[in-house]
């Protein structure tokens, strides 16, 4: 099979990359009614599978889970989760033939096997759903022409999808219809009903394309969301210890620092995050971020280029075929780093201390978010999509590091994200070492002293921060999320 994106001509590629429309709330006036009375069968009962299913059932839909025979016979975790939550569970052969909508929520690397197994069992005119378009776009999976193919992609981990729904809210969501598979013209109605059933319409829905979702999702997770946090954690920890900081304190400053500073990012964008600093520290963080952007721009561009061309996907799929040799090696090496093995600090670090002593970390966040956003937009991805795949998801990933360091982040994210994270961080760490060697006192681990600042310089820096395109689109999109739960700041 050929990479679907690479079979398109340039005009088609640009059209699909640039497909992005913020949908009005009135477009979801019918809620999930289009799927009411129809049978929805979910394949896979991981975090997205279970939590989307719970939301959809609570929205009045008929939900069941199709699992492999061995998973049922051996009562594996997927079977236990589905049955303990009161869902009907059966084999593919028992449930798929009656399904009006089959939702494939298995890991990316299983998609081809799953889809090739369920396709022959699906009835004529049924629909197939995804929450990530990798199988369609990068693998180039061919789906029967009578089958409608749709996507509903919540921009949060599965647990967050459920928690926000229980609060009567939801999480921002991308929806799409595969243009090669919409024989009855009902794909958008199915996708809208599915999104409404998960609660996504309450937080904002973007009508996108499979191509735009995949290319932007891969870019975000490889660079700012995971790769930058991993590279930054390793570099900052080593720098602190090298300068005599207690390893336990250094570890805590970094582990919980990302979460604390990105909570400000979530509530008020880069502007609020930078406003948490004193004026001298803000000027220094801005200067550091500009240096970082200049150094890292070629690396961000390379990742985007490799994602657009399919080079990244072909390399990762080759590793799948080689039993994940590279992935597992990188995972093991990460687990042995000094940051991951450092002792725990029993003392308390105050919230403002994370900002005052983490000027470099704030600069890394600013540089990474802006670079990821700019690189995506330069490649034809619309600003709203680029925002969700860079700034919006960052606090959620930072929260995983706060739980159990990089180990937890790499466990929670997909194998696809983890593989891309290692590619980026293994290139970024040596790239930034000369920069790290030139840091000044107060950049990391010590507060920058209060002092006089030049009013004109401060005015210009504030204007530069607030006028960046990601701040403009972010302000608009956050307006739809005013009811979002505040991620608890770790202490």
Swiss-Prot record:
Pathway: Amino-acid biosynthesis; L-isoleucine biosynthesis; L-isoleucine from 2-oxobutanoate: step 2/4; Amino-acid biosynthesis; L-valine biosynthesis; L-valine from pyruvate: step 2/4
Binding site for substrate: 414
InterPro entries, per database record: 6-PGluconate_DH-like_C_sf, 6PGD_dom2, KARI, KARI_C, KARI_N, NAD(P)-bd_dom_sf
Keyword hit for Endoplasmic reticulum: no
Keyword Amino-acid biosynthesis: yes
GO molecular function list: ketol-acid reductoisomerase activity; magnesium ion binding
Catalytic activity: (2R)-2,3-dihydroxy-3-methylbutanoate + NADP(+) = (2S)-2-acetolactate + NADPH + H(+); (2R,3R)-2,3-dihydroxy-3-methylpentanoate + NADP(+) = (S)-2-ethyl-2-hydroxy-3-oxobutanoate + NADPH + H(+)
UniProt cross-references to Pfam families, sorted A to Z: KARI_C (PF01450), KARI_N (PF07991)
Active site as annotated: 132
GO annotation (BP), single: isoleucine biosynthetic process
Annotated positions binding Mg(2+) 1: 217, 221
Gene Ontology, cellular component aspect: cytosol
Cofactor remark: Binds 2 magnesium ions per subunit.
Domain of life: Bacteria
Cofactors required: Mg(2+)
KARI N-terminal Rossmann domain mapped to chain residues: 15-208
Binding-site residues for Mg(2+) 2, renumbered to this chain: 217, 389, 393
UniProt domain KARI C-terminal knotted: residue ranges: 209-344, 345-484
Keyword annotations: Amino-acid biosynthesis, Branched-chain amino acid biosynthesis, Magnesium, Metal-binding, NADP, Oxidoreductase, Repeat
Record-stated family: Belongs to the ketol-acid reductoisomerase family.
PANTHER family membership: KETOL-ACID REDUCTOISOMERASE, MITOCHONDRIAL
Annotated function: Involved in the biosynthesis of branched-chain amino acids (BCAA). Catalyzes an alkyl-migration followed by a ketol-acid reduction of (S)-2-acetolactate (S2AL) to yield (R)-2,3-dihydroxy-isovalerate. In the isomerase reaction, S2AL is rearranged via a Mg-dependent methyl migration to produce 3-hydroxy-3-methyl-2-ketobutyrate (HMKB). In the reductase reaction, this 2-ketoacid undergoes a metal-dependent reduction by NADPH to yield (R)-2,3-dihydroxy-isovalerate.
Protein name: Ketol-acid reductoisomerase (NADP(+))
Organism (species): Escherichia coli O6:H1 (strain CFT073 / ATCC 700928 / UPEC)
Gene symbol of the encoding locus: ilvC
């Amino acid at each position: 099979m050929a990479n679907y994106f690479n079979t398109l001509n340039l005009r088609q590629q640009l059209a699909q990359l640039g497909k992005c429309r913020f949908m009005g709330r009135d477009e979801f006036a019918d809620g999930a009614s289009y799927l009411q009375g129809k049978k929805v069968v979910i394949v896979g009962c991981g975090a997205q599978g279970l939590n989307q299913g719970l939301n959809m059932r609570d929205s009045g839909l008929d939900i069941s889970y199709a699992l492999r025979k061995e998973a049922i016979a051996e009562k594996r975790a997927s079977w236990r989760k589905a049955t303990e939550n009161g869902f009907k569970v059966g084999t593919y052969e028992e449930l798929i033939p009656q399904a009006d909508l089959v939702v494939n929520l298995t890991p990316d690397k299983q998609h081809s096997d799953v889809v090739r197994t369920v396709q022959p069992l699906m009835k004529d005119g049924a629909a197939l759903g995804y929450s990530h378009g990798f199988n369609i776009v990068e693998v180039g999976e061919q789906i029967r022409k009578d089958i409608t193919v749709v996507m509903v992609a919540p921009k949060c981990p599965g647990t967050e999808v459920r928690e926000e729904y229980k609060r009567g809210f939801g999480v921002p969501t991308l929806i799409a219809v595969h243009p090669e598979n919409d024989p009855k013209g009902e794909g958008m109605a199915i996708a809208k009903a599915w999104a409404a059933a998960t609660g996504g319409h309450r937080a904002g829905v973007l009508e996108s394309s499979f191509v735009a979702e995949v290319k932007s999702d891969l870019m975000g997770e490889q660079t700012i969301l995971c790769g930058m946090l991993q590279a930054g954690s390793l570099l900052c920890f080593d720098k602190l210890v090298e300068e005599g900081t207690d390893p336990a304190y250094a570890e805590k400053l970094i582990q919980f620092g990302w979460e604390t500073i990105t909570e400000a990012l979530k509530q008020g964008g880069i502007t609020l995050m930078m406003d948490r600093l004193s004026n001298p520290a803000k000027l220094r963080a801005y200067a550091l971020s500009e240096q970082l952007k200049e150094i890292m721009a070629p690396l961000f561009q390379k990742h985007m280029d490799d994602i657009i061309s399919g080079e990244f996907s072909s390399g990762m799929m080759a590793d799948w075929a080689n039993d994940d040799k590279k992935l597992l090696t990188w995972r093991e090496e990460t687990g042995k780093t000094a940051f991951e093995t450092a002792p725990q600090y029993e003392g308390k670090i105050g919230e403002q201390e994370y900002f005052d002593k983490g000027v470099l970390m704030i600069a890394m966040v600013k540089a990474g978010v802006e670079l990821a956003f700019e690189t995506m937009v330069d490649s034809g991805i619309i600003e709203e999509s680029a925002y969700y795949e860079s700034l919006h998801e960052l606090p959620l990933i930072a929260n995983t590091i706060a739980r159990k360091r990089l180990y937890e982040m790499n466990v929670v994210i997909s194998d696809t994200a983890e593989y891309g994270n290692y590619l980026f961080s293994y290139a970024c760490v040596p790239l930034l070492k000369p920069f790290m060697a030139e840091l000044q006192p107060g950049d990391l681990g010590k507060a920058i002293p209060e002092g006089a600042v030049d009013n004109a310089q401060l005015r210009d820096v504030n204007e530069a921060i607030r006028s960046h395109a990601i701040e403009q689109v972010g302000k608009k999109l956050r307006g739809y999320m005013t009811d979002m739960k505040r991620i608890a700041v770790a202490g």
